[in-house]
A protein has these predicted regions:
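Alpha-helical metal-binding/catalytic segments enriched in His/Glu/Asp
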Residues: 63, 77-123
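Extracellular/periplasmic catalytic domains that process cell-envelope and extracellular macromolecules
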Residues: 2-3, 54-57, 68-71, 110-113
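Solvent-exposed loop/turn segments at secondary-structure junctions
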Residues: 17, 48-49, 68-70, 81-85, ...
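A non-catalytic alpha/beta surface segment that caps or lines the substrate-entry region
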Residues: 5-66
């Protein structure tokens, strides 16, 4: 999978507005891509940070690529995976999510000095 494939998969005609099937599909897609990287030696896994606001359920997805020096503060890279209404959202923000997925894939095989946290934010 590459960046273009990820953008295409995320920027569909369903949109990714919170509470829609497209939003749920985007979350499942990101989780699937992260799970496919789990076998990599330096990817410590991912977790979901679920919350509820205004009657809606939200879920931030976080993955850490651990570094050697735990005394150094981690670097945080993030992008939101929801979109407004039924818009496909290639530029808002599927492209940035695709870049984060590629960063996870590239860093998963690297031994880093500093930890990196990748955050896929919900609305």
């Amino acid at each position: 999978m590459g960046i273009e494939d990820d953008v295409y998969a995320l920027a569909n005609n369903l949109g990714r507005a919170v509470g829609t099937k497209g939003h749920e599909a985007a979350r499942d897609y990101i989780l699937g891509r992260l799970e496919s990287l789990e076998a990599k030696p330096y990817l410590s896994g991912w977790f979901e940070a679920k919350y509820r606001y205004g009657g809606q359920d939200f879920c931030n997805l976080l993955v850490q690529v651990p570094g050697r020096d735990h005394s150094l503060a981690p670097v945080l890279l993030g992008a939101h995976y929801d979109t407004c209404d039924s818009l496909p959202g290639a530029d808002d923000n599927a492209a940035a999510v695709a870049v984060l997925l590629e960063v996870a894939a590239q860093m998963a095989d690297e031994e880093l000095e500093r930890s990196v946290i990748l955050a896929f934010f919900d609305a």
